[in-house]
């Protein structure tokens, strides 16, 4: 029995030592120097290290609807060093956590771009804290030492093996060193028939015949949007010198036409919070009935636009930022 116990303890210690050496989430204060990069598929584990990286001075925060905003292009347009911290299906709670973590390590951040989409506009009575992907809250607090308590598990071991493969040149990073990944670049995946299947559930287009009114308006005051209650938390605590863009990213018109009043109400509420807390912020509303949102080939599915559209969004961010600097206020780009 003693031999068995000793063997188990020894094996466990070796496994834990391997995990600590590989530092799969780049979260340890002390670990051997290696050419690490994000390897965990779950961005909630991969991105805290990027949020702490002092090589950046600006960030994109949101869900997958702003994941295609490319840091390298934003850097050129805005004269900054961007990291994209947008995560698939990120709840507003997670977005607030990510923003606070970034600001802990970047108290003089130059730019913050927030994507406001269905994650904020959901009709709900309660707040979602996390998704089925799980949320390692210990990675988002100010104490990195406590991360060591949560690393002895099969997922950390799996990602340590991936990190070893990466260091040995046997694996590519899951995400770029600036958090970017283009998930829309497969030509086969962009065949129009497939795109329309993902948008409409059919191979033929079913565009709304009449224009869809998506202007911000107080049209559903009785609707409970619990997530929107956290929007003030997102904006609070951001340094006065940080330039903020609140972006309503463009989704396909078919998706928006299913419940336009909800989007109108959500945008009205978000705009009210921005005007109260950060009137210096830019509000860029692309969640509109437009040539962009009516063109099927601009989309990967009903929610996600492709890289060519992302580039147009980035240019719009740069234009509105410059207009705001010159004394503008609320800007819409159609």
Give the role of each language-model region:
Residues 96, 224-232, 262-273:
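Well-ordered, non-membrane alpha-helical segments in soluble/globular domains
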């Amino acid at each position: 029995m003693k031999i068995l116990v000793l063997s188990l303890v020894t094996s466990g210690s070796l496994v834990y030592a391997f995990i600590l050496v590989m530092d799969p989430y780049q979260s340890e204060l002390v670990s051997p120097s290696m050419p690490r990069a994000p390897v965990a598929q779950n961005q909630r584990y991969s991105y805290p290290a990027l949020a702490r990286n002092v090589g950046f001075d600006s960030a994109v925060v949101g869900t997958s609807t702003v994941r295609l905003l490319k840091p390298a292009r934003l850097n050129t347009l805005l004269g900054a060093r961007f990291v994209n911290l947008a995560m698939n299906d990120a709840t507003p709670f997670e977005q607030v956590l990510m923003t606070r973590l970034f600001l802990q390590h970047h108290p003089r951040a130059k730019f913050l771009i927030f994507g406001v989409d269905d994650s904020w506009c959901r009709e709900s009575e309660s707040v979602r804290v996390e998704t089925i992907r799980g949320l390692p809250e210990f990675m988002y607090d100010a104490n990195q030492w406590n991360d060591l308590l949560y690393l002895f598990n099969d997922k950390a071991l799996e990602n340590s093996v991936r990190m070893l493969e990466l260091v040995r040149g046997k694996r590519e990073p899951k995400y770029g060193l600036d958090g970017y990944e283009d998930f829309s670049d497969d030509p086969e995946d962009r065949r129009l028939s497939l795109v329309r299947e993902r948008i409409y559930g059919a191979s033929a287009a079913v565009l709304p015949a009449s224009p869809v009114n998506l202007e911000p308006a107080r049209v559903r005051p009785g609707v409970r949007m619990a997530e929107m209650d956290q929007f003030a938390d997102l904006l609070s605590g951001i340094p006065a010198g940080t330039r903020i863009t609140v972006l309503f990213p463009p989704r396909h018109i078919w998706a928006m036409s299913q419940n336009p009043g909800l989007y109108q109400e959500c945008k009205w509420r978000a705009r009210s919070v921005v005007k109260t807390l950060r009137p210096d912020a830019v509000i860029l509303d692309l969640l509109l009935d437009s040539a962009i949102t009516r063109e099927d080939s601009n989309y990967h599915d009903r929610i996600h636009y492709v890289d060519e559209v992302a580039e147009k969004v980035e240019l719009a961010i740069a234009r509105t930022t410059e207009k705001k600097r010159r004394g503008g206020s609320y800007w819409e780009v159609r």
